[in-house]
Regions:
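Short, glycine/acidic-enriched loop or turn micro-motifs at the edges of active sites
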Residues: 44-45, 74, 160, 227
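Active-site metal-binding motif and surrounding structural segment of the metallo-beta-lactamase
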Residues: 47-93
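C-terminal regulatory/interaction regions
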Residues: 229-269
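Conserved beta-strand hairpin/beta-sheet module of binuclear metal-dependent hydrolase folds
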Residues: 1-55, 144-147, 151-155
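Active-site neighborhood of phospho(di)ester-bond hydrolases with catalytic His/Asp-centered motifs
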Residues: 40-42, 64-72, 92-96, 153-156, ...
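Short, flexible loop segments at the rims of nucleotide/cofactor-binding pockets, characterized by
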Residues: 15-21, 43-45, 68-71, 129-135, ...
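Metallo-beta-lactamase
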Residues: 5, 93-222, 227-232, 241-243
């Protein structure tokens, strides 16, 4: 796991996954060093990852007060229950639907839950975190937030981009990605993660894009993109094009078999 600071108040815990035929997808969690510290998502649920151990290199888990779960997919909840054990004062910020989805894997203690809906806000001591639903998402439980002190939007899956190399997936600045490559990757991800974008009312969809524009964030932090500093206009312009981008169709069984055959060692002569 690649761990680094972005700005004064935020630590990025960066991981990534390779999706064959798509690219290297960043998988970020964050620590917001507020007066009441907030962990945003809890990493991948793979057996060789130890999210709590990595997190402990950044902050004592006993000091954590909030775990903001942007949605309950496994690339966001990998360390959740271990972190609840290690951080006895922390409460999980999620929605009613989020609790329901999580409970299909393991019961979530309701005294450790704080239900928050889009449009509401959370006081974390020295700032308020304003909850919103991002324009693009793959889960009805998705809730991002805007930190009015650092002028940062935490957007969950929205604005994600599978990248051509692992090094780019690890970079600490989305400006390292050429603009045309970033645009193409974000449009691909929009159609992988939110295929419904092709069937919604375009005018109403663009209103949700403008809602981010009205916040005018300096930084956009997506789970699946390196930190985007000073790129808000560029990223919103790309998001506005998502309904007209090519729909994504994944490999079928024949393509999978061809892919697996390519991995087989050549027969001896």
């Amino acid at each position: 796991m690649h761990i680094y600071r972005t700005g004064q108040d935020i630590t990025v815990l960066n991981d990534h996954l390779e999706a064959p035929g798509i690219g290297f997808l960043p998988a970020n969690a964050f620590v917001l060093h507020a007066r009441e510290p907030v962990v945003v998502d809890t990493g991948l649920g793979l057996p060789d990852r130890d999210f709590v151990r990595a997190l402990a290199s950044v902050i004592d888990p006993a000091d954590i007060r909030w775990i903001w779960l942007t949605h309950p997919d496994r690339d966001h909840t990998g360390g959740l229950f271990d972190l609840l054990d290690a951080a006895p004062l922390a409460r999980v910020v999620t929605t009613f639907l989020g609790v329901g989805i999580l409970s299909t894997e393991r019961p979530l203690p309701l005294d450790r839950v704080y239900l928050l809906n889009p449009g509401q806000s959370l006081d974390v001591g020295d700032r308020r975190l304003h909850a919103f639903r991002p324009p693009l998402y793959d889960s009805p439980a998705t809730v991002g937030f805007y930190d009015d002190r650092t002028r940062t939007c935490f957007t969950s899956d929205c604005f994600g981009a599978p990248l051509p190399t692992a090094d780019l997936a690890r970079t600490g600045d989305a400006r390292d990605i050429p603009a045309d490559e970033l645009r193409a990757a974000q449009l691909l991800w929009a159609n992988v993660d939110s295929p419904w974008v092709h069937i919604v009312n375009t005018g109403q969809y663009l209103q949700t894009v403008r809602s981010i524009q009205h916040l005018d964030p300096d930084v956009i932090l997506s789970t699946h993109l390196p930190p985007a500093i000073g790129l808000t206009t560029q990223l919103l312009d790309t998001l506005a094009q998502a309904p007209g981008a090519d729909p994504f169709t994944g490999p079928d069984q024949q393509a999978l078999e061809q892919m697996l055959a390519a991995f087989q060692p050549a027969a001896p002569a």
